[in-house]
Design a protein with these regions (language model features):
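Internal helix-loop-helix
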Residues: 3-73, 113-120
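A short, Trp-centered hydrophobic/proline-enriched beta-strand micro-motif
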Residues: 72-80, 124
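A glycine-rich, basic-preceded beta-loop-alpha segment at the flavin cofactor/substrate interface
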Residues: 25, 145, 152, 157, ...
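A structural signal for short hydrophobic beta-strand segments in well-ordered beta-sheet cores
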Residues: 94-97
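A short core secondary-structure module
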Residues: 102, 106-152
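Active-site-adjacent elements of ketosynthase-type condensing enzymes
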Residues: 84-92
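Short Ser/Thr-interspersed hydrophobic loop/turn segments at strand-loop and sheet-helix junctions
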Residues: 6, 29-34, 124-125, 141-146, ...
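Glycine-rich phosphate/pyrophosphate-binding beta-alpha loops
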Residues: 86-87, 110-115, 157-158
Length: 186
């Protein structure tokens, strides 16, 4: 019901299934939503990758992903952090080498919240080693059901599991899943 009314994404434009509300209307809704103790939804699709796709995605990417994000049909996770990179995201090592109309992705992400539940991951990958480390990074949308992807749990001290490692071994990703220009994902 919330999705049908656009209330799942009150800051999304009406054309993509949101309400088109202004900041005041959105704030009032958020306060009432919290007062009702309604459950929060995962931010990865609605708040993080959805707006990126709206701003920088192709029309085909918008048509493919936005309706499935707002309906809750497609669950996302974020692939940024890597072992050895710490808070220096630009030092990422996961490589995506272009072969024709695909990238071949190899590497690892860590501290990936809810990857074990996600259908897709949006990831920063290194597509070039030339220039400063902030250059040569591209933004890819990757289907987690693609062969070569392994999700391993990171069990917390209390026995909980919401963080994961995600391994990419010769994962083939269509070039059409890149957001924006190659090497301009930073």
């Amino acid at each position: 019901i919330l999705a049908q009314k656009g209330w799942i994404a009150p800051n999304w434009p009406v054309e993509y299934g949101g309400t088109g509300w202004n900041a005041t209307q959105k704030h009032i809704f958020e306060e009432e939503y919290q007062a009702a103790q309604a459950p929060r939804l995962s931010p990865f699709g609605l708040i993080m990758v959805g707006p990126v796709i709206m701003a920088f995605g192709t029309e085909a990417q918008k048509a493919e992903h936005l309706p499935k994000i707002i309906s809750g049909e497609r669950f996302w996770c974020q692939g940024y952090s890597e072992p050895g990179s710490g808070s220096d995201l630009a030092s990422l090592k996961t490589r995506a080498v272009r072969e024709g109309d695909e990238y071949v992705v190899n590497g690892q992400k860590i501290w990936t919240s809810h990857a074990h539940h996600a259908d897709w991951i949006f990831a920063l990958v290194r597509t070039s080693n030339e220039g400063k480390k902030q250059e040569g990074i591209s933004f890819l949308l990757i289907d987690l059901n693609t062969p070569g992807i392994e999700v391993r749990p990171i069990i917390s001290i209390d026995g909980g599991h919401y963080l994961n490692e995600v391994f990419f071994t010769d994962v083939r990703v269509p070039v059409g899943n890149r957001i924006g220009d190659e090497n301009k994902g930073w």
